[in-house]
């Protein structure tokens, strides 16, 4: 392998969720259960570790990139503008939230997009509620994934989660309110 050719003594494969947990400072060899939810752009996984082993695991074959796609569709349907993936990601990071009540305090964001009606680029305002709709389903599925992993774990490990909580990793962990 390339690592051996480069002078490494040995090469080990490590689960990405385990690497994220160790990077977050968790001791996976300890008896207390730790739940790590890795929220990436391409996939979302939830892994319950104890004694250095996986006690329960689940994943969604998509990540928060799905929100980007939904933001693009929402902007086109509700505002009549086409935007690119990077603009949708910027809107998600600025206005996106996992908190359902956030639409009550609506925030506007100026964005440039291609006006479908006028066939030219224009600046328009995006409201929080448009992005909230794009986030809701994916957030609900993340909550369902976590519940499923906890439900499938041995009962004695559930008590540890009350003390230890859940560790969120990945770029999607920055979605406002996801840690609630």
What is each residue range found by the language model?
Residues 1-41, 47-166, 173-180:
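Nucleotide/phosphate-binding catalytic cleft detector across ATP-hydrolyzing
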């Amino acid at each position: 392998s390339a690592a051996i050719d480069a002078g490494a003594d040995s090469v080990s494969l490590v689960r990405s969720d385990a690497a994220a947990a160790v990077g977050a400072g968790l001791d996976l060899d300890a008896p207390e259960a730790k739940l790590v939810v890795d929220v990436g752009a391409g996939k979302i996984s939830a892994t319950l570790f104890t004694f250095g082993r996986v006690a329960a695991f689940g994943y969604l074959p998509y990540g928060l990139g799905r929100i980007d796609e939904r933001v693009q569709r929402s902007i086109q349907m509700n505002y009549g503008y086409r935007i690119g993936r990077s603009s949708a990601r910027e809107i998600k990071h600025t206005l996106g939230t996992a908190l359902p009540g956030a639409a009550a305090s609506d925030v506007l964001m100026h964005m440039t997009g291609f006006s479908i009606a006028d066939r030219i680029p224009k600046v328009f305002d995006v409201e929080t509620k448009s992005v909230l709709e794009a986030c809701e389903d994916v957030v609900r599925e993340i909550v369902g994934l976590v519940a499923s992993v906890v439900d499938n774990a041995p009962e004695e490990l559930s008590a540890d989660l009350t003390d230890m909580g859940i560790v969120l990793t990945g770029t999607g962990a920055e979605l406002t309110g996801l840690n609630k």
